[in-house]
């Protein structure tokens, strides 16, 4: 596990270690805890693990997903974390959730509008959004994080794609890159949805990226490197 400080540029520093070596997991957080979910340490598993963001150290076991999967999308409100879609090894429509400041197994939340993996999640304090995904739809689902239920289709990406990175400032969500290598960045307002609009281009086409943000800017980390972008505008 590495970390960076948003207000300064520079290389990532060592934070600690996951419970085991793994790939194709996802993660989300509130201001205190980060939770990493699923993945593949040799076979697809259901492990959830957490860290306390303010202090470096190794991850601790949190509990288990309702269904073992990888390539899922995680998002959160200040109190609840949701995990959407993934591969089981077939594409999954499962949504499950946890309460971030407790530990324990995930609980069923509902279903996406279609089974898919490698979508791009973003969230506000009330809504989680899952955009795109494999096998290649452009549709964008949302859920209301505080109440269980199925995903609702409320818009489309400007270009159908998957395996990009999502980041947000709790008002606007941005979606950057995709498989196969793309430099597309588009955005939408989380509260209203609709068709995503062009935001700008990445410095290089990249895929399998992950995005993070504070309230001012975001970082998109993919196969071709890391680039900051100001979420509130375009660029």
Please provide the spans of the model-predicted regions.
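Polar, enzyme-active/binding microenvironments
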Residues: 1-235
